[in-house]
């Protein structure tokens, strides 16, 4: 037996339709506010962790070591590190011999 034809005023969808409407309404909120909420939660957790001296001391040591390494590497650089290697002279000589 076929179901009766639906009337123009007949509302179907029930719970599934309601959830779909709520989901569509929440999607832009989650999309735009989600990263902000995640970042604020991470910053709050980081702020709570940084109060602990057991984690603050090793972080300071690591930061000092990284800064020292960066400054030493920067100071000893003489500018040759970015230049291309010089062409090999032995290859040039072989090319000249082949042409003769």
From Swiss-Prot:
The keyword Translocase does not apply. It is a multi-pass membrane protein. The chain crosses the membrane at residues 19-39, 43-63. It comes from the Bacteria. The keyword Zinc does not apply. It is found in: Cell membrane. GO terms for biological process: response to mercury ion. GO terms for molecular function: metal ion binding. Disulfide bonds: none annotated. Keywords: Cell membrane, Membrane, Mercuric resistance, Mercury, Metal-binding, Transmembrane, Transmembrane helix, Transport. Hg(2+) binds at residues 31-32, 82-83. One of its GO terms (cellular component) is plasma membrane. Involved in mercuric transport. Passes a mercury ion from the MerP protein to the mercuric reductase MerA. This is Mercuric transport protein.
């Amino acid at each position: 037996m076929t179901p009766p034809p639906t009337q123009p005023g007949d509302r179907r969808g029930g719970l599934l339709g309601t959830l779909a409407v709520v989901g569509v309404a929440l999607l832009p909120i989650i999309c735009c506010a989600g990263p902000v909420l995640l970042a604020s939660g991470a910053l709050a957790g980081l702020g709570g962790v940084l109060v602990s001296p057991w984690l603050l001391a090793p972080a300071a040591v690591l930061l000092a070591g990284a800064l020292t390494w960066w400054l030493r590497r920067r100071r000893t650089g003489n500018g040759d590190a970015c230049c291309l290697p010089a062409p090999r002279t032995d290859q040039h000589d072989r090319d000249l011999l082949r042409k003769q």
